[in-house]
Each structure stands twice: as structure tokens, then as C-alpha cells.
Amino acid sequence: MESSDQSKSELAREPEPDGTLLESSLGYRFRNPALLALALSALKQPLTPETAAARQRLEFLGDAAWNFAVALAVFRTQPQASPGDLTRFRAAWSSRTGLAQLAGRIGLPIPASPSPRGPSQRVLAELLESVLGAMVEDGGFEA
């Protein structure tokens, strides 16, 4: 995480009220619940530029960790698959559609949206990636 005073103050915020339910759904308890609150900050509008940047950093970390975890799982569970097939499996699990569906299955809070159809798959995927990034930042890759 960034070491600026603003980032530290953002991390000091209290977690969202539904954080405990989400932790139960994730099967992970945050040692630093403020990281989960930061990941879920996209649910609030407007965000300060500092909060948005810190949340995007968690999203970056979550995206990288997810891609690695999926690649490892596909590699181990598909021993006969060609490299092209492995890439397609990983792409399916890492797509916006796949991530948005997973976000719904694990019960991530749904951000408000001006669209009657709700938030886009991109928004849900990014929210999931930021939560995954918060988990990795909080507990390491084993989280």
C-alpha cells in the first residue's frame, strides 16, 4: 500500500456494516478490516482521488493474484491440456463475465447504478478484484 498520510487515513476507516457477512462468504477474516472497507469503497460515490487510486491498486493486486491462482489451478487439474487450452480455461475464469458471476455467487454488495439493469460486469469484476487484492495485502497469497 501507499505510505502517504492520505492513504493511511483512508485505511483507518471503519469497515462496511456488511463486512462480517462478506468475510463469512469469502471464508476469510481480515486482520485489518480497513482493507476490506477500502476495497468496498467503490460502493460509495464520490470517491476522493486518493481513495480511488488506493482502491485501484488493490484491484491491480487482486487481478494479478486471481490470474495466477486460476493459472495454477488449471495447470494442476488439466494435465493433458495444451498450452492453448490452458489459456482458454484461464481466460474464461478471468473474464469480466466470469468475475461478475463469481461476485454475485459469493454475495459481494452490489454498487448503486443509474442503469435499471444494475452495475455493469466491469464494475462487478473490478469490485471483486479489489476485494481479492485486499485479501492478499492483508494475509499474503495464502489468503
Language model region names:
Residues E2-A143:
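RNase III-family endoribonuclease catalytic core
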